[in-house]
Amino acid sequence: TDENFYGHSKKSYERVRNLFKGMVDRGIYQNWFGFTSLNIYEDDETLDYMAKSGCVGVLIGIESINEDALKSMNKGVNLRITIDKYKEAIKNIRKHGLAVWGTMVFGNDNDTPDTFKDVVDFILDAKIDIMTCGILCPFINTPLQKRLDGDNRLFRTNFPEDWIYYTSHHLTYVLSKLTLQEFIDGIEYVYNNIYSTEVIRKKFRAAKDEMNNLNAAMFAFRVNLDWQEVYKHLLENLRELQASGDYERALERYEALKR
């Protein structure tokens, strides 16, 4: 994540541990939430102080359960921990009564129609309390944008008007191993199995029992309801793109230039 309070050095770990220990020692209790990375899961002492200081959860950039996709995103911390240990890491964080808010990105070149079910299975098996999923966004002048542009796959390039599409809620490039319909079907599968009201309520009931922290469970419940609407909007954007014909025209152009 961008605002990683835990960091990646021994000095950083000690600073964070001392901060939350200081809050606990002084009787300071404040509901709070922070952004960090998976490597925090091994630091039980810090996690304990975080919970006692009022932390309700942490956001962690999981991004993908595909190793090649993680390499393409330079997610070094996740690769060092290895995907096999993701569930163990999440379980240990939740053991301290902290909700885990994961983020996932769809639209990588390695994504296939099977990716969406694999991700849903992982989210449910790992008991991730909140999962926010978005579409890979090729921000201007990034290596990703330059690569997609060089391959003639970008189709939202009429700037400044097209800046509105450069969020994680819009598709701006031709997909690699998916048709647009497969992508929409996959996103809809995620919505039905992660963001439905029934699933959100079920996760809330489980979180109350498993984390033994009502504040954390309520926090996750509220965020999930918010993201239910956000993800619905993402789906609407994809359907509007399909109806406009812009994607099919971009695909035809891409295929013609490949010949």
PLM feature segments, named:
Residues 1-6:
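Active-site groove signature of glycoside hydrolases
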Residues 13-212, 236-239:
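A structural motif corresponding to the C-terminal lobe/cap of the Radical SAM core domain
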Residues 204-259:
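Membrane-proximal basic amphipathic "stem/tether" segments
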